Regions:
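Small-residue-rich hydrophobic transmembrane alpha-helices
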Residues: 57-117, 154-173, 282-339, 343-345, ...
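Helix-terminus/linker motif at the lipid-water interface of multi-pass membrane proteins
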Residues: 39-58, 127-134, 190-196, 257-287, ...
Length: 452
C-alpha cells in the first residue's frame, strides 16, 4: 500500500482524512528517514571500530555533546519553523507560512556560521573539557574540524527538511534523508577503507552527503509547484516570526543542550570509573538506544503537522485521537527494542568492535540503560505533543525535568551509594526515565481535561 508515498496537493486534508491514513502518510516517511539516519550512525561507528580501532570509537563518543549542540540549534530553527508553519496552514494563512520558510532559511545561515566559527576556534580546549585524553583527542579533533567547516550545510539541510515535511511533503523529506544516508555510507566506506583517511574520512562523507541532500531540498523550495516555496518579496526577517520560531523550537533546543550537558557528566563519570574504553562503551549503547528513539522521533514528526493543524483549526477530538494512537505505537516499538537488547546484548554490541573489554562493558551497560524503554516511548510522544500545539513552555519543562531534575542528581549520587561506581552511572538512566514518564502523564491528563 503506497498511498503514503503520494505527495499531498494541499495540507488541508489534515482536517478531513482518516487519522490512521494520515499517520501512515506522514509518519512512515519520517520514521524511515530517521531510522535510516540512525542506522547510518551505527554503521559509521562499525566502520570506525573495525577500520580504525576501539579508541576511535571513544574519540567519536567524545564529540557527542558538540554534535548535540549542532542538532540543538538546527532543530530549534527547523522544528520551531515546522510547527509554526503547520499552525498557520491550519488557520488558512498561507502567506504567513511562506514567511516562516524564508525566516528559517536566514536563521539557519546565520546560526550555522556563528556556531561553526566559534567552536572551531576553541576546539581543542572544548574537547579537553569534554573529557578527551592524549589518546582520544586526535580522533575527536579530526572528526569535528571537518564537521564544523561544513556547519552551514548541516543547518540548512536539517532546518529546511523539517519545514518541507510539515508543509505537506513528508515523502520528499524522507527521500532527502535517504539520499543523504545512501551517499554517506558509500563515501564513508571508500574514505575509511580504500583511501585510509580514518575518522576524518567519516566526517568528510557526512558533509558531502548532506550537501547532496541540501540540493534536493532547495530544488523543492525553488519550484513554484510546491505548495509553500521561495517567493520574491519575502526575503526578510520578521521579528515576531523569529520569536515564535525560537519559542516553539526552544523545547527541542533545550532537550539537546541538556543532553549535551548530561553526556559531558556521563563521559567524565565513565572516564573516572572505567577509563577511555568505558566512554566508548557508552558511545555504543548510545548508538543502539538512539536507533529506537529515532523511530519514535520520526513518529512524532509525522504526528506534528496533524496535531498542529487540527489544534489550529480547533478540532480537538482529532487532536486527542491522534495523540492516543501515537502513544500506543510508540510504547509497542520501544518494547521491541527493550526485548532485543535484553535477550541479545552481546551479539548487538559485538557488531561494533572485536575488542573483548569494550564489548563486555557495553553489553552489561546496555541491559541496564534500556530497562524502561517502553515508558520512554510514551514520555517522548507527550513532550513532543505539547511542542506540536505551540505549548513550548510545557514541553520545555517536561524535557528539563528528565535531564536536570532527575538524571543529573542521580548521576552524582548513585555511583557513590553502596560502591555502585560505574553501575551507578548506568542505573541513573532507567530510574530517571520512570520519573520523567510519571511527570509527563500527570501533565497530559491535566491539559486534556482543560481542553475537554
Amino acid at each position: 500500500m503506497l498511498f503514503f508515498m503520494v505527495a499531498s496537493k494541499s495540507p488541508h486534508i489534515l482536517e478531513t482524512a482518516p487519522i490512521g491514513k494520515l499517520l501512515l502518510q506522514y509518519s512512515i516517511p519520517a520514521i524511515i528517514a530517521m531510522t535510516v539516519t540512525s542506522l547510518y550512525n551505527i554503521i559509521d561507528s562499525i566502520f570506525i571500530g573495525h577500520g580504525i580501532g576501539p579508541l576511535a570509537i571513544s574519540g567519536l563518543a567524545l564529540t557527542f555533546p558538540l554534535m548535540n549542540l549542532v542538532i540543538a540549534f538546527c532543530t530549534q530553527i527547523g522544528v520551531g519553523g515546522a510547527a509554526i508553519s503547520s499552525i498557520y496552514l491550519g488557520r488558512k494563512d498561507d502567506n504567513k507560512a511562506t514567511e516562516v520558510l524564508h525566516n528559517v532559511l536566514f536563521l539557519c545561515i546565520v546560526a550555522g556560521i556563528c556556531f561553526g566559527s566559534l567552536t572551531y576556534y576553541f576546539l581543542d580546549e572544548i574537547l579537553i573539557f569534554l573529557g578527551a585524553s592524549e589518546a582520544t583527542l586526535p580522533y575527536a579533533r579530526d572528526f569535528m574540524k571537518v564537521i564544523l567547516m561544513g556547519n552551514v550545510i548541516s543547518f540548512l539541510f536539517i532546518g529546511l527538511n523539517n519545514v518541507m515535511r510539515a508543509t505537506g511533503y513528508p515523502q520528499k523529506a524522507m527521500l532527502s534523508s535517504l539520499l543523504t544516508v545512501g551517499v554517506n555510507l558509500v563515501l564513508a566506506s571508500i574514505f575509511i577503507f580504500y583511501f585510509g583517511w580514518g575518522i576524518r574520512g567519516a566526517a568528510t562523507a557526512t558533509i558531502l552527503s548532506q550537501t547532496c541532500g541540501l540540493f534536493w531540498v532547495l530544488k523543492h523550495f525553488f519550484s513554484s509547484s510546491s505548495y509553500i516555496h521561495f517567493k520574491r518579496g519575502y526575503y526578510y526577517l520578521r521579528i515576531k516570526i523569529v520569536a515564535a520560531i525560537f519559542s516553539v523550537g526552544m523545547a527541542p533546543f533545550l532537550i539537546n543542550v541538556c543532553a549535551a550537558a548530561i553526556v559531558i557528566v556521563v563521559n567524565h563519570s565513565f572516564k573516572t570509573y572505567g577509563g577511555d574504553l568505558a566512554i566508548g562503551a557508552y558511545g555504543i549503547v548510545n548508538r543502539i538506544a538512539t536507533l529506537f528513539l529515532m523511530v519514535i522521533i520520526g513518529l512524532t514528526q509525522g504526528m506534528q503537522p496533524i496535531v498542529g493543524y487540527n489544534y489550529g483549526a480547533e478540532h480537538f477530538d482529532r487532536v486527542r485521537q491522534t495523540l492516543h494512537r501515537v502513544i500506543g505505537v510508540a510504547v509497542s516499538i520501544m518494547t521491541i527494542g527493550w526485548l532485543l537488547s535484553e535477550l541479545f546484548p552481546i551479539s548487538i554490541v559485538g557488531m561494533f568492535s572485536d575488542d573483548a573489554a569494550l564489548n563486555g562493558l557495553a553489553s552489561s551497560g546496555l541491559r541496564i540503560a534500556i530497562l524502561c524503554f517502553p515508558l520512554v516511548g510514551a514520555q517522548v510522544v507527550i513532550t513532543n505533543f505539547f511542542q506540536s500545539i505551540g505549548k513550548a513552555q510545557i514541553s520545555i519543562l517536561l524535557s528539563l525535568a528528565r535531564q536536570l531534575l532527575f538524571l543529573l542528581p542521580l548521576l552524582y549520587t548513585l555511583p557513590y551509594i553502596a560502591d555502585w561506581n560505574i553501575y551507578g552511572v548506568w542505573w541513573s538512566m532507567p530510574i530517571s526515565d520512570v520519573l520523567a514518564f510519571l511527570s509527563a502523564v500527570f501533565t497530559l491528563k491535566w491539559y486534556l481535561r482543560k481542553i475537554s
